[in-house]
């Protein structure tokens, strides 16, 4: 069987969030992912998370998603679903750019069995913003999938420039080094 072959090969398995919402404690729910797997919200053959949630889920699946992932309006449904994948025990999590950008069905990569219109979506340069980079990094770092950004150090006031030595100390040093300098000259 495929499962036996996978176990014998040592390769990680795949877990796809979009296969998880069936009303039960499915093995495809993120808390059940084994560590040795790759977690995906969806694959290139699935709709985007937004497209899936809006067009392919039932009311019961949406209700389960809201409860299981503790989805809130403030965080946003897509961000909450991504959080679930990133927080899973999976050693590796892969999220498409279309899902990070919260795109709908217009950004779907491939529809199996449909020979037309596939692999045409491209990310627009205007969508690659510092805010998006920060979101990806913060969510990845929160679940130890990236190094945290270094904390910004508060600006320190410059210390006053060192003051020259007192004249008395300079004179004392000149007295103690003068005989050594004179001896060095006479040795030549």
Residue ranges and their predicted role:
Residues 1-175, 179-188:
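Catalytic cores of glycan-processing enzymes that make or break glycosidic bonds
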């Amino acid at each position: 069987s495929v499962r036996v072959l996978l176990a014998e090969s040592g390769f990680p398995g795949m877990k796809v969030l979009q296969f998880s919402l069936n009303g039960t404690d499915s093995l495809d729910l993120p808390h059940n992912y084994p560590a040795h797997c790759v977690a995906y919200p969806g694959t290139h053959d699935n709709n985007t998370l937004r497209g899936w949630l809006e067009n392919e889920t039932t009311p019961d699946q949406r209700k389960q998603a809201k409860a299981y992932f503790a989805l809130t309006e403030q965080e946003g449904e897509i961000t909450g679903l991504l959080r679930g994948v990133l927080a899973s025990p999976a050693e590796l999590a892969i999220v498409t750019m279309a899902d990070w950008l919260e795109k709908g069905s217009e950004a779907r990569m491939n529809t199996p069995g449909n020979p037309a219109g596939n692999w045409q979506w491209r990310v627009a340069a205007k969508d690659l913003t510092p805010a998006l980079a920060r979101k990806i990094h913060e969510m990845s770092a929160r679940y130890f999938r990236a190094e945290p950004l270094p904390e910004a150090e508060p600006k320190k006031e410059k210390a006053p420039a060192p003051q020259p030595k007192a004249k008395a100390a300079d004179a004392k040093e000149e007295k103690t080094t003068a005989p050594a300098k004179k001896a060095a000259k006479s040795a030549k």
